[in-house]
From Swiss-Prot:
GO terms for cellular component: cytosolic small ribosomal subunit. Residues 1-22 are annotated as: Disordered. PROSITE patterns: RIBOSOMAL_S18. It comes from the Bacteria. Keywords: Ribonucleoprotein, Ribosomal protein, RNA-binding, rRNA-binding. It comes from Streptomyces avermitilis (strain ATCC 31267 / DSM 46492 / JCM 5070 / NBRC 14893 / NCIMB 12804 / NRRL 8165 / MA-4680). This is Small ribosomal subunit protein bS18B. Transmembrane segments: none annotated. Part of the 30S ribosomal subunit. Forms a tight heterodimer with protein bS6. Binds as a heterodimer with protein bS6 to the central domain of the 16S rRNA, where it helps stabilize the platform of the 30S subunit. GO terms for molecular function: small ribosomal subunit rRNA binding; structural constituent of ribosome. Gene3D superfamilies: Ribosomal protein S18. GO terms for biological process: translation.
Length: 78
């Protein structure tokens, strides 16, 4: 029996939230922005979920880690 052809769904790429809002500098003191990239358990969300570039993901991770060190963000929320 011949296989059915696989249909690819053409989806528009989701926009980068940082570029869309014009954010160029990611600061560890901006906890409202950083919380958007954390899960409800306090973990940093992946690039695939947040749609940021690799460089922005590295800057976000560094800012979140600095904010945790300064006790602005929790390490985890249980």
């Amino acid at each position: 029996m011949p296989r059915k052809p696989v249909r690819k769904v053409a989806s528009t790429p989701r926009p980068n939230p940082l570029d869309q809002n014009g954010i160029t500098y990611i600061d560890y003191k901006d906890t409202d922005l950083l919380r958007k990239f954390l899960s409800d358990r306090g973990k940093i969300r992946s690039r695939r979920v947040t749609r940021v570039t690799a460089q922005q993901q590295r800057l976000l991770a560094r800012a979140v880690k600095n904010a945790r060190e300064m006790a602005l963000l929790p390490y985890s929320s249980r």
